[in-house]
Every structure is written in C-alpha cells, then in structure tokens.
Regions:
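Glycine-rich phosphate/ribose-binding loops and adjacent secondary-structure elements
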Residues: 163, 172, 176, 180, ...
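Non-catalytic, usually N-terminal nucleic-acid engagement modules in DNA/RNA processing proteins
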Residues: 1-183, 296-299
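Hydrophobic alpha-helical packing residues
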Residues: 21, 162-169, 209, 238, ...
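Generic secondary-structure signature for well-ordered alpha-helical cores
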Residues: 136, 167, 171-174, 240-243, ...
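Glycine- and acidic
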Residues: 148-152, 156, 216-222, 331-334
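Conserved, mostly hydrophobic/aromatic
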Residues: 21, 54, 89, 131, ...
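C-terminal extensions of enzymes
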Residues: 1-15, 23-32, 39-40, 143-149, ...
Length: 376
C-alpha cells in the first residue's frame, strides 16, 4: 500500500509496499517486456544499477513461453530470478497496437497473434487469469487503448466499456487471489484512466474508477501522438480526482524532462522502453544532455559516457571504446549502453527523491528539466 511521506507542491515523496518489498517513490520501472531487459541485462544487473521495480508484458508472456509455463515454473519472480516487485501490464496496449484484424466486443477483444497469426481472445477475466499465473505484485486492468486523436463519441463509448471491464477485472482479481493455489494471493489490481485528450471525459472516468477503491491508479493512453503540453494538461486535469492515498502511475512515459514535469504534477510511478531502446542505437543520456555515440567526434574520446556518472560502465569504459563496439556491431555495445541509460534513469529518480526529501525539488526542476532535454 502507499504511504505519503512528504510533498512539495503537487510533487509527492512516498513509499509503496507489496509482497516483494517496499518501493521508494517516485520510481521508474525498468521494462523487461518478455521477462528480460532488451540489451542482455540480467536480474542481477538490475539490482546493481538500482532498479526497484521490473515491468513485464502480459501479452508477450502469454504468447511465449505462455503464462501456464511461467506458473508451472513457480511464477515470474522465480522464473527470472528477480526477488523485487514486478508490475505486469494488462496486454491491452499490445492487443491494440501490434495485433491485426482485432474485433472489439463487450466480452473482450478477438485478435490475431502478431507472431503466427493464430486467433486469440482476451477479455478482463482472461487478462486477470494470465497475470495471476505470472504472479506479479501489481496487475493492470484490461482496457482499450484509444488512438490520439479519436472522435469524441467513440472515446465516450470506449471509456464506458473500459469502466465495465474494470468492474469485471476487480471481481476476477479478488476471486483468483482467494484460490488456495494462486501464485501470489496478495496481487494488487490498479485501474487505468482513459479518455484521449478530452479533459472532461478523463475527469468523469477518473471519478468513476476512483469510487472502486483500488490500491493504485494509472493514466493511460498518453505519449501516443499528442504534444508534451497536451499530456501535461491532461495530467493536471485528472490529478485532483486521483485518490491522494493511492499510487499514481503515468504509463509509457517518458523522457527525463517528461518525468520531472510529471512528478511536479503528482505522479509516482513511470515506465518507458525509450532509455533501453535509445541505448541500443547509441543514444545515451548524460547530466548535460543526450549524446549520439556513433558521432565521429567520439572516435578518440577517452572520457566516460558521462564524467558525472558512477555507473559500472562509466567507471571503466571510454566513449571511444563503446563507439568502436557499436561500429563493429558487437553485442557488448548494446549491453553497456543499456546498462548506462537505465542506471541514469534510476539515478534520476533517486535525485528526485532526495530533492523532495530536502525540500529542494523545485530547484532541481529548474536546473535539470530543460537541460536534460537537449542534445550535445
């Protein structure tokens, strides 16, 4: 459960406790889509770079190796040898973004696998069963991820259906948690706010899902085409209606600047594939801004990726060496780059928490919000 420790404006410093530990918030969840970080990082690596929460994907694990296999192996924690908290998303985003020939019905969604084209059905109960088999600490509600922009009439109908699906998710999560052989009987369900960029629809939906008294709530359907300012406006509109005693999660966001600005608006949890994805293409974060290590100017650069960084990579390797690895297409390049970028994100959250602890978050925001958005 969530405990608010301190606040500065709307920014919140807190703790979230679940079956596998206590999380210091604000926090960035490191994304291991298929039970692993893309870039060859292990669960041990995650511990060494300060990861608190690992996020895995319901849709992908349902397809491979299947959630039933993971259950037979004792759950996702045991399967991937990660003993910290795990959040699994519902699979909804992937159903709507990856799958072809999808058909949305009241009971759920019929779609074709992006791997082999086989027909699959997923509804609220199926998503809850899959996530129960995985045994995550936090399971996300099954929702429809709406494209931006979408017609207002369709958005209204969609969020009404997403609300009805959430009611079904809550009932099924409670039923599964009560079973004697469930993997994690303390699994918590978080609801997801939708509504595209229509603030009034977002607010109405947030009010309704808040009445269901869930342990946490997410803002979904952002960072999918709207501007950063539109995203911030939606957060500001919805935040007053998010329960103050529950965790708040902004799904799929974002850049370091996005995170700082969302923390300032009251968000506690974040996730994004971007730091690892950027790293795999030699785009690396530093405390002065982002660099592209494939640039020829780094060919003879003996300095670390970031002289201000104390990650395992920056303590040992030069820009010139890692650039060489990328040019030579060595696998080690991706591993070192991903390790650095995820360490940077975890350290960013630590600095944000420290700033909140000392009452200096606004000063931190002024110093870094714009600086971290630039390319050098």
């Amino acid at each position: 459960m969530f405990k608010l420790l301190k606040a500065e404006g709307n920014a919140r410093r807190g703790e979230f406790t679940c079956a596998h530990g206590t999380v210091q918030t604000p926090v960035f969840m490191n994304v291991g889509t298929q039970g692993a970080i893309k870039g060859a990082l292990s669960a041990e690596d995650l511990k060494n770079i300060g990861c608190q929460v690992e996020l895995s994907n319901t849709y992908h694990l349902h397809l491979r190796p299947t959630d039933k296999v993971v259950r037979e192996m004792g759950g996702l924690h045991k399967f991937m040898t990660w003993d910290g908290p795990i959040l699994t998303d519902s699979g909804g985003f992937q159903v709507f973004s990856l799958s072809s020939l999808r058909k949305i019905k009241e009971e759920g969604v019929y779609f074709a696998s992006h791997i082999d084209g086989r027909k699959i059905f997923m509804g609220p109960e199926e998503s809850m069963q899959i996530q129960s088999n995985l045994g995550s600490d936090i399971c996300m509600a099954f929702d429809e991820c709406i494209e931006n922009p979408s017609p207002r009439d369709y958005v209204r109908k969609s969020v009404d259906r997403t609300y009805r699906w959430l009611v079904r998710c809550k009932a099924e999560n409670a039923r599964l948690n009560s079973l004697p052989d469930t993997v994690n009987p303390q699994q918590m369900l978080w609801g997801i706010n939708q509504g595209s960029t229509y603030a009034d629809i977002r607010i109405d939906h947030m009010k309704r899902i808040a009445d269901l008294d869930l342990p946490g709530y997410a803002i979904g359907g952002l960072a999918v085409g709207e501007t950063a300012e539109e995203m911030y406006d939606i957060i500001e509109a919805v935040e007053p209606y998010m329960p103050a005693d529950k965790t708040r999660y902004l799904m799929g966001v974002g850049t370091p600047t996005n995170i700082i600005e969302a923390v300032a608006r009251g968000v506690d949890f974040f996730d994004c594939v971007m730091p690892a994805r950027n790293a795999r293409h030699a785009r690396l974060f530093t405390w002065e801004g982002a660099i592209n290590l494939k640039n020829a100017k780094y060919q003879l650069d003996e300095s670390p990726i970031d002289p201000k960084c104390d990650c395992p990579v920056c303590r040992r390797y030069s820009r010139a060496y890692i650039r060489h690895l990328f040019v030579a297409e060595e696998m080690l390049a991706m591993r070192l780059a991903v390790m650095h970028n995820l360490y940077f994100y975890n350290k960013l959250m630590e600095k944000i928490r420290n700033a909140l602890d000392s009452g200096e978050f606004e000063a931190f925001r002024r110093e870094y919000s714009e600086k971290l958005n630039r390319r050098i």
